[in-house]
Amino acid sequence: MKAKIHVTLKPAVLDPQGKAVQHALGSLGFFGINEVRQGKFIEIDLNETDTAEAQKNVENMCKQLLANTVIEDYAIEITE
């Protein structure tokens, strides 16, 4: 099984990296961009056959290490 995890800043948290990318895109001539938010994508190859157990384990990984839940949200997708 594979776990795909998207970690993003919570909407209320300022994103200086996103602002820098937005500014750079404007400098390169890309206009009409309202906002850029930057995050992380993590893919984990799991040695697990039970989808519910995999979801539970990855949820714990996110809470304990992969995401700073004070300022970040995360979304998990489990695939076989």
Stretches found by the model and what they are:
Residues M1-P11, I42-E43:
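Short glycine-/aliphatic-rich beta-strand segments at the starts of folded cytosolic domains
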Residues H6, V36, D45, E77-T79:
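Solvent-exposed beta-strand sheet faces enriched in polar/charged residues
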Residues A12-L28:
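Short amphipathic alpha-helix segments
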Residues L14-P16, T49-K56:
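Short, conserved charged micro-motifs
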Residues Q17, L28-G29, M61, I78:
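Short beta-strand/helix segments in adaptor/scaffold domains that form protein-protein interfaces
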Residues F31-R37:
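N-terminal glycine-rich anion-binding loops that anchor highly charged ligand groups
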Residues G39-D45, T49:
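Short, charge-patterned binding micro-sites
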Residues A52-E80:
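C-terminal structural segments of small proteins and small subunits
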